[in-house]
Regions:
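A charge-rich, low-complexity, intrinsically flexible signal that marks solvent-exposed coils, linkers
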Residues: 2-136
Length: 136
């Protein structure tokens, strides 16, 4: 990897030049035209990131097809913490409709985390609870 600060991994390839990165991003999604990030509303970006965090956290909590191989509670805690911080910080900007759905999903993975944990955290100390308060 170069130390330009512009390195990115796309489809398992390290892209080191900004121009090549732009080309690679434009060619993703089976040749479909990449959407100009400047055209995407912030609420849509926040929702997309939150859904990715939520999905990854669910898998790491053992809620996917192969829980024996995919469960990783340390990783789940990190993802849930990130989602809790994002949702809490952006709730006012998202509006009630979007924020409520994200909070419901967040609560679900927080409860799944508690259930999967062999050593339950104290109330208020669980994954993401620093930002959401105790979940039960």
């Amino acid at each position: 990897m170069s130390d330009t600060g512009h390195d990115r991994i796309i489809h398992d390839h390290v892209i080191t030049e900004p121009e090549l990165l732009e080309e690679a991003l434009a060619e993703t999604a089976d040749g479909a035209a990449a959407r100009d990030i400047a055209e995407v509303p912030a609420v849509e970006i926040i929702n997309t990131v939150a859904v990715h965090l939520l999905s990854a956290a669910a898998v790491k909590c053992g809620l996917a097809d192969d829980p024996e191989q995919q469960t990783d509670l340390d990783e789940a805690r990190k993802l849930i913490n990130a989602m809790a911080g994002l949702v809490t910080a952006s709730a006012a900007d998202l509006g009630d409709h979007h924020a409520r759905a994200l909070r419901d999903g967040l609560r679900s993975v927080q409860l799944a985390f508690r259930e999967a944990s062999p050593f339950p955290d104290a109330p208020g100390e669980g994954a993401g609870e620093k930002w959401t308060g105790a979940v039960n």
